[in-house]
Each structure stands twice: as structure tokens, then as C-alpha cells.
Regions:
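Hydrophobic residues in alpha-helical segments
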Residues: 19, 28, 43-47
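An amphipathic alpha-helix signature
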Residues: 9-16, 36, 40, 44
């Protein structure tokens, strides 16, 4: 069973290593490696932002296994937020993705009622599609995003079902 805490500035290097891991870059809409100074600036803005939740997941031994980020969209987009996930390569294939998505989504929606969480997933990323489906996300659209065939999946707070 996993637990989570919110990321702090001290987690910047852990997130940097995760974001530049080859499989993470391959499944990102921007596949270029991230430079450290750019990452530090990006990370520090988000860790302090009230519209961004950085969930850091730990296993029973307290070892970080992955992260989920949920960011509220711009004001003009209504009550929508975008989710992203990455799992440490040594913990992939163990079902942690589904558990992380469930825990983060449920926590976010419990403190942000009325929001819809939106996931953009490469069609070829079958593991992520399965994790999101198992975590209660519903396929709402299939389209190209930045030239890549993608699934758009959503999860709403229980009050909206």
C-alpha cells in the first residue's frame, strides 16, 4: 500500500531524475531532455503554487515510487484540471500507477468539488491507459495532440456522476 505527501523544494532533484528518465521523455508531448536550471525554476513555481498539487508517493519502506501532478486550468477553462503521472522505473509494472491515480484524484476532488480531472495519454501507452481506466477515468475523446494520436480521459467528482 502506498502513502503520499506533497512535494517540497527538497524534492527537486528526485523530480528532475524522474522527468529525464528515457521512458518518461518518450511518453511526453515534449520529448526533449529537461535542463536542470529550467527544471528548478519550473519545479519551484509549481511546488509553491496554490493551483498545483504535487503528490509524491512512497511505498511501505518510505521509498519514493512515483509522482502525480494535478494542475488547475486557467480561469477561462472552468473547473478543469490536468493530471500527469510518472513512476520510478524500478517500480513499474507493479500496479502502483492505478493506486497513485486513485489516491491523488480522490484527494484532489475531495478538496476541489465540482472539478473534472483531464488526462492526455498517448494511444500507444497502453500501461497508462489501463492505469487511468482502472482508476475510474473515462475515455471522452480520441484525437491528435501535438501531432500524436492521443486519448483524452476524464474523472469527475462523485457528486457529478
Amino acid at each position: 500500500m502506498l502513502t503520499f505527501r506533497f512535494a517540497t523544494r527538497e524534492d527537486v532533484d528526485l523530480y528532475f531524475n524522474w522527468t529525464n528518465e528515457a521512458e518518461v521523455r518518450n511518453n511526453s508531448y515534449n520529448s526533449s531532455p529537461v535542463e536542470y536550471p529550467d527544471h528548478v525554476s519550473w519545479f519551484n513555481k509549481r511546488v509553491d503554487a496554490p493551483d498545483c498539487s504535487l503528490y509524491l508517493f512512497l511505498n511501505e519502506e518510505g521509498v519514493p515510487v512515483g509522482q502525480v501532478r494535478i494542475e488547475k486550468g486557467p480561469t477561462g477553462e472552468g473547473r478543469r484540471s490536468v493530471i500527469s503521472i510518472s513512476t520510478d522505473k524500478q517500480f513499474r509494472g507493479m500496479g502502483h500507477g492505478t493506486e497513485m491515480l486513485q489516491l491523488a484524484s480522490d484527494d484532489f476532488l475531495s478538496v476541489n468539488p465540482g472539478y473534472t480531472i483531464v488526462a492526455y495519454i498517448f494511444e500507444v501507452n497502453k500501461a497508462s491507459v489501463k492505469s487511468f481506466k482502472n482508476a475510474g477515468y473515462v475515455l471522452t475523446e480520441q484525437k491528435e495532440v501535438k501531432g500524436i494520436p492521443s486519448f483524452i480521459m476524464e474523472k469527475k467528482s462523485h457528486a457529478e456522476h
